[in-house]
Amino acid sequence: MNKSFIKNKLKQESFVPSKKMGQNFLLSNNIKNKIVDVANINKDDLILEIGPGWGAITEILVQKTNILIAIELDKRLYAHLKTYIKTSNFHIINNDVLCVDLDNLILDYNNTQKIQKIKVVANLPYAISSKIVLKIIQSKLINDAYIMVQKEMAERIGAKVNTRGYNAFTVLVQLFCKTKILFEVNAKEFHPQPKVQSAVIHLENLHNSVNFNIEELGKFLRICFLNKRKKLKNNLSNIYDIKIINQMFIDYNLDMNLRAENIEPKMFLKLFNYLNR
């Protein structure tokens, strides 16, 4: 599948990409091959693709693995892929990924085969990419994700403590997985061209055994980063008793002047547990 194929398909079928779904189709053969290459796929890996679109990456993935599962919301693209890729190792469902239990879906196709690793390989729809990332990192089965997202989001996910991009989302993701930005992708490699640059990142799931409510932790982190210029204890005092906060800082030997951007992810988890015990 090349640029001409996709552009001709768009013309022939009067296909108007959905802004609501964040549809920007990858045209570059070089980039799609590069994404698959960095995923280092073994035949015994189960691959999950989210938002396969016209199948630019799908047609390569299906040659690399014994089990490829794709989730596509757009009924037009779902119908296209049902006829375009007919190999027995390809399975596609027409659904919103945010409504799918990923682990249950994987188990449905993993009851007879010997699986080495479970990997997500995808060009994510940018409008909901943060929500998809949160689903991926909470999976008990997914080992790795090689995903394309907005460059800005990639930088937030991979941000280090004491840097500008470090925020609540950074901390939440890094509590669940190791992160690495692999390479950037220019907007001209898509149709229609997005207004932002993109990047491919690797998430290695830590399969965190720590028992906590991710929604409650997310709320806590947003409070911590509510005003990045304020001291952390001042942000926390909007919700928690200042006396308890001060004692917590003493117990953990923390500087009272620290801001949220100065705190490592694992320490945030300790603070969360301390204040919510």
From Swiss-Prot:
Its main location: cytoplasm. Its EC number is 2.1.1.182. SUPFAM superfamilies: S-adenosyl-L-methionine-dependent methyltransferases. InterPro entries: KsgA/Erm, rRNA_Ade_diMease-like_C, rRNA_Ade_Mease_Trfase_CS, rRNA_Ade_methylase_Trfase_N, rRNA_adenine_dimethylase, SAM-dependent_MTases_sf. It comes from the Bacteria. PROSITE patterns: RRNA_A_DIMETH (PS01131), SAM_RNA_A_N6_MT (PS51689). Keywords: Cytoplasm, Methyltransferase, RNA-binding, rRNA processing, S-adenosyl-L-methionine, Transferase. It is an enzyme of class 2 (transferase). The keyword Transferase applies. GO terms for cellular component: cytosol. It catalyses: adenosine(1518)/adenosine(1519) in 16S rRNA + 4 S-adenosyl-L-methionine = N(6)-dimethyladenosine(1518)/N(6)-dimethyladenosine(1519) in 16S rRNA + 4 S-adenosyl-L-homocysteine + 4 H(+). Gene3D superfamilies: Ribosomal RNA adenine dimethylase-like, domain 2, Vaccinia Virus protein VP39. It holds the Pfam family RrnaAD. The keyword RNA-binding applies. It is found in: Cytoplasm. GO terms for molecular function: 16S rRNA (adenine(1518)-N(6)/adenine(1519)-N(6))-dimethyltransferase activity; RNA binding. S-adenosyl-L-methionine binds at N24, L26, G51, E72, D96, N123. PANTHER family: DIMETHYLADENOSINE TRANSFERASE (PTHR11727), DIMETHYLADENOSINE TRANSFERASE-RELATED (PTHR11727:SF7). Specifically dimethylates two adjacent adenosines (A1518 and A1519) in the loop of a conserved hairpin near the 3'-end of 16S rRNA in the 30S particle. May play a critical role in biogenesis of 30S subunits. Belongs to the class I-like SAM-binding methyltransferase superfamily. rRNA adenine N(6)-methyltransferase family. RsmA subfamily. This is Ribosomal RNA small subunit methyltransferase A. The gene is rsmA.
